[in-house]
């Protein structure tokens, strides 16, 4: 899988960490360039490990071993502050539109790679709305969860 590297400054450096979850987000923006700019902004103080464009280009912004700032105040079961235990994937989408086929295809490929590498169970592939239900809605009602879970 081809992954393009781009620079991001919003993360905490770690030598090693336990990755238990993958958190899926939408950018809330239709424009890939603006989404990347926001994720790179030192003022915004947000980031993700990966971003997938509408055409299916995969970008890595933060190395997996480091903590990206994507989950915010979050909880799943007894685990809190999920930035520490997760990989964040941003998908360029406003949240009000269907997700393009090429984008979902590349997301599936990335999920398979990460799940295998870190031994992440399907039940631990979550949406931002799962871990912060009172604050977040992404990846939203148009996200194809059923197809994703069946194909991983």
Spans of model-derived segments:
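N-terminal catalytic cores of peptidoglycan-degrading enzymes
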Residues: 1-80
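Short coil-to-beta-strand
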Residues: 80-88
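Basic/polar, cationic surfaces and motifs that engage anionic cell-wall
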Residues: 85, 94-152
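Short loop/turn segments at strand-loop or loop-helix junctions that form parts
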Residues: 90-92
């Amino acid at each position: 899988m081809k992954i393009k590297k781009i620079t991001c400054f919003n993360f905490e450096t770690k030598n090693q960490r336990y990755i238990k979850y993958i958190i899926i987000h939408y950018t809330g923006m239709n424009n890939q360039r603006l989404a990347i700019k926001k994720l790179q902004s030192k003022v915004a103080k947000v980031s993700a490990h990966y971003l997938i464009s509408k055409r299916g280009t995969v970008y890595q912004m933060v190395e997996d071993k480091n903590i990206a700032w994507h989950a915010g105040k979050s909880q799943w079961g007894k685990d809190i502050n999920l930035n520490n235990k997760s990989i964040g994937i941003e998908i360029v989408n406003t949240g009000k539109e269907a997700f393009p086929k090429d984008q979902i295809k590349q997301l599936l490929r990335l999920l398979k790679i990460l799940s295998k590498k870190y031994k992440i169970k399907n039940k631990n592939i979550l949406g931002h709305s799962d871990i912060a239900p009172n604050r977040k809605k992404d990846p939203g009602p148009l996200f194809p969860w059923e197809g994703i879970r069946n194909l991983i």
